[in-house]
Amino acid sequence: MKDVIALAKAKESAMIRDLQGWIRCGSVYDETTVSTEKPFGEGVSNALEWMAQTAERDGFMVDRCDGYCTEITYGTSPEIVMVLGHADVVPLGAGWTKEPFGGVVEDRILYGRGASDDKGPTLAAYYALKILKERNYPLKRTIRIVVGGNEESGSRCLHHYFQELQRPHPIYGFTPDAEFPLIYGEKGIMNYRFQGEIHDDVLHYLHSGVAANSVPDSAIAHLVGHTFSAHQFESFLRQAGTTGSLEINKDQAILTVHGKAAHGSTPEHGLNALSLLLKFLAEHTTSSLAKHFASKFLAYDGSGLDIQFSGERMGALTMNLGLGSYENGHYSFILNIRYPIDCDPHILSQTLGQHALHKGELMSDSAPLYLDPESPFIQTLLRIYQELSGDKKTQPMTIGGGTYARNTVNTIAYGMGFPNGGHGSGNIHSPDESLAIDDLVLGTAIYLRALFELANM
């Protein structure tokens, strides 16, 4: 197979049009529109249907999988090479300067929620398969693309696909939902909640966060009977390197603290507005809730909760306080924890429970993933990336992020994020999420060769 970059480049305009159309299907999970036919709500259902109709347009076999996934198949061999992408996106959050569901292109960069996570990369893999089909390249194995609808909030889509529908697992697979060159290991992912009923003399209302796996970029609290001054609040914000607002009306106050959004697997890249707000309340008010939890949530290494841990193969545990609320006497804080393969999740959960004020609850736990980085499968994908990108410096890695790879076998994360943001892609889970057109083309070329070689190994 020669000149795959030219083959991908020839599809550039069509890919841009299709990606814009897909992004316009705003596909945040919406519980209010969930039904039997639309298990993740109307927006996600529309995005899955868009992909189904696009594949039918191009002559592929399509299965809608009870509304949980869109399955696209090329070939009839029982041995399957699989691509796992997703159509759902995280909530928007604040701070966008582009239309979030517009897909606008400026200076060869396409903006929109889902541009790089994960509609753009999934579409790149789809166009790679489309090129293979159109040019009738010989393939020994079936290639199947499965587009899920619930990656960002539990992966119930793939549970339904593999467990309920009993669809076959792949011989080889990859998900275009992380970084190049490739990810051969993923930390375990635990969601843990502290909750209970409490009467707080000062705190009347608290809200922050859009998802457990995102660093909150804003937090708001309503107080009654506060004793701090505006100067103290302003000084706190300056020292924290952030901004906020304060409204005072007699003995009542509304505080807002701004932070910086980031993916929950890399809390060090963000600034957690919720943990900062709790810190201020603990230091400058008599809030019993803040005083109990503030110091526990500050450090993203988990040291405040005695769960700090570092492993030889995957590095250190990280913790993100993703969601927090207090209303009508009920509080809830949800932690998103990424732990290495050497860390015992049972001990981790038990240790967290010891810090509960009322109730600690293990919400979910997904075990770590680890494949041999020296295997022929992984070395093949690495070689293809290096040959087409020219990048022989960046090494395969393990990550704290969780992808679809852990839901099946013989599957890793393979792109589509390029080192150092490629040509301008990024802001995953943040405002102005983007995908550079040049990265879209190169990613498509890499996936084209990868699918061809994996299907013929």
Where are these regions (language model features)?
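A common structural junction motif
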Residues: 88, 237-245, 284-285, 354-359, ...
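Buried hydrophobic packing segments
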Residues: 122-132, 161, 223, 277-281, ...
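Acidic, glycine-rich active-site loops and adjacent beta-strand->loop/helix elements
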Residues: 87-89, 143-154, 176-181, 210, ...
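An extended, acidic, His-containing surface patch that forms the Zn2+-binding/catalytic region
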Residues: 53, 265-328, 334, 338-347, ...
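Acidic/His- and Gly-rich active-site-bordering loop/insert found
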Residues: 1-113, 137-139
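Midchain, well-structured core segments that form catalytic/ion-binding scaffolds
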Residues: 159-340
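Active-site metal-coordination/substrate-binding segment of hydrolases
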Residues: 80-147, 153-154, 166-168, 426-439
